[in-house]
């Protein structure tokens, strides 16, 4: 009986110590060591896989997910570190900032895929003036969100170090998350509009009627494929290409899980640093860690490189509401099945360099700010 009591007290000791510590940054909660180490391993594996998947030449998507993987690993290292010292500001900031902004890069990779899907199905399904407008608008929005969140996190860190109020930093951080959530909500509306157009509207067009009936499901994708862009029919119709057939579903799952996670983070900060959500880790495990893991595993299996035949097919993003090959007095933009591997590489390289210029620069600046923040705090201690 005595041994059982001692074991129980021993298991509760970290929680009792944290609750008694007035400097605790988690409101008395101690991050679970086993769970956070497990997440470091899982994200390490996912990060390695996405490095290998760079070979599929979906550069934007893979680099975006690599950035996410790095931030998730760093964030869970911070939570593991916090297990032994819940009052350590460096560990808390590493956890809070990295895990909070990681989805910005995930969504950056996802936004670009909608532009590619519009190219595959046809420009007429785009609600915006150009497929690239989706990427440009939402990636710019994410960059703004990232910068605002980084500034808010930095202000909170400095305030705690100086022993002053974190109210301003917290409000800035919340504003950054609110921008991200609002941007994702608008993207979700545009995403479901696109799905409605390619799955419902084309069937109405095919039967020249607009019934609201389950009978529409009896019309196969093969029957309505003639209403899509002819140039990429080989991507859509090959029967064994299950990765492409379920790619839109995978994208939907990923976006909804990340959106759920971002709403949770926003609510967590609104409630406060010592509120109910941040002091009960199960909310974090289910609504943050699990949501991000589901999204990333889903798009690791249904990788755009597999869906779009990234090693042999180029899908350049072109402007306008009309498919380029249908315009009068114009030649095809390019042969999409190019036998020249070097030409294919050059095309993808140019697209990648153009699209990655600002996000990569922002990511470097952000990581530099984190390093400087930790460095200045350590100097202040000395």
From Swiss-Prot:
Which terms under GO biological process does the entry name?
A: lipid transport
Subcellular locations according to the entry: Cell membrane
Induction record: In response to loss of mitochondrial DNA in a transcription factor PDR3-dependent manner. Induced in response to altered glycerophospholipid asymmetry of the plasma membrane in a transcription factor PDR1-dependent manner.
Q: Which GO terms describe its cellular component?
A: fungal-type vacuole; plasma membrane
Q: What residues are glycosylation sites in this protein? A: 3, 6
User: Any transmembrane segments, and where?
Assistant: 35-55, 58-78, 91-111, 136-156, 172-192, 242-262, 282-302
Q: Read off the Pfam families from this record.
A: RTA1
Question: What InterPro entries does this protein map onto?
Answer: RTA1
User: Which ranges make up the Extracellular topological domains here?
Assistant: 1-34, 79-90, 157-171, 263-281
Taxonomically, which superkingdom?
Answer: Eukaryota
Q: Which residues lie on this side of the membrane: Cytoplasmic?
A: 56-57, 112-135, 193-241, 303-382
The way this protein sits in the membrane is described as: Multi-pass membrane protein
The record's keywords, sorted A to Z, are: Cell membrane, Glycoprotein, Lipid transport, Membrane, Transmembrane, Transmembrane helix, Transport
Protein family membership = Belongs to the lipid-translocating exporter (LTE) (TC 9.A.26.1) family.
In UniProt terms, what function does this protein have?
Catalyzes the ATP-dependent translocation of sphingoid long-chain bases (LCBs) from the cytoplasmic site toward the extracytoplasmic side of the membrane (flip-flop). Involved in the establishment of the functional lipid asymmetry of the plasma membrane. Regulates intracellular levels of LCBs, sphingolipid precursors that are growth inhibitory at increased levels.
Protein name per UniProt = Sphingoid long-chain base transporter RSB1
The gene from which this protein is expressed is RSB1
